[in-house]
Curated annotation (Swiss-Prot):
Site (Transition state stabilizer): E154
Chain positions recorded as 1-deoxy-D-xylulose 5-phosphate binding sites: D12, H13, R48, H53, T103
GO function terms (MF aspect): pyridoxine 5'-phosphate synthase activity
InterPro entries per the UniProt record, alphabetical: Aldolase_TIM (IPR013785), PyrdxlP_synth_PdxJ (IPR004569), Pyridoxine-5'_phos_synth (IPR036130)
Protein name, UniProt field: Pyridoxine 5'-phosphate synthase
Location in the cell: Cytoplasm
Single GO biological process annotation from the record: pyridoxine biosynthetic process
Catalysed reaction equations from the record: 3-amino-2-oxopropyl phosphate + 1-deoxy-D-xylulose 5-phosphate = pyridoxine 5'-phosphate + phosphate + 2 H2O + H(+)
Amino acid sequence: MPHFIDLGVNVDHVATLRQARRGQEPDPITAASLAEQGGADGITFHLREDRRHISDRDVELFVQTVQVRTNFELACAADVLAICCRVQPDWALLVPESREEVTTEGGLDVAGDSGRIADAIQMLKDAGIATSLFLDPEPNQIEAAAKLQVDAVELHTGPYALARGAAVQHELRRLADTGKMIRDAGMRLHAGHGLNYVNVRPVAAIDGMAELNIGHSIVSRSVMVGMREAVAEMRRLLDSVTIAAQ
């Protein structure tokens, strides 16, 4: 069955578990292979400036061994940009980054910092890498991204994932409205952050959604059922949305 919504699996937290003992296992490269077997359409990994989980060696091995699309998540930092341009993943996702944060806490401020981001985008484009931006579902940010002519925008779904009660529908509407802006501007619509097996279907059902990137919930589930099955379960959820829409 065709995968009308692509599933990108973020394997960062396999590396987080490895780093808890500063050892060699679990191996995120093996996890990526198992995710592919479970139905992942892409593998996402974030090489942070502090190298808290994914390592430079991991990045090299992902690009060399992953058979589906590779999605290199990074900040606009010169050394990491240079690594990305050298290893040439299929996609680069630019995100904000703070050493104090536990995980990415919000989208890029493209509207307020377009110069630095534009320079990073140009470097990536010159290297032949498709580019996307991680943005909050705010119209001014989408308008700024459209001017930079990126290939995709990944909407930050964290506020939706944390919402309760009536706020859930409010956040879904924000995602749907800005998603339409993204598609109308000719960019590919992606989304991610905080999505799990309970809350993913309404986001997957947003008109024109092309790709969801999901990490922590899949890695958490994999502790119980294995990576291949954890990814397959998420794949079935996304496929059920596609079937319902037909």
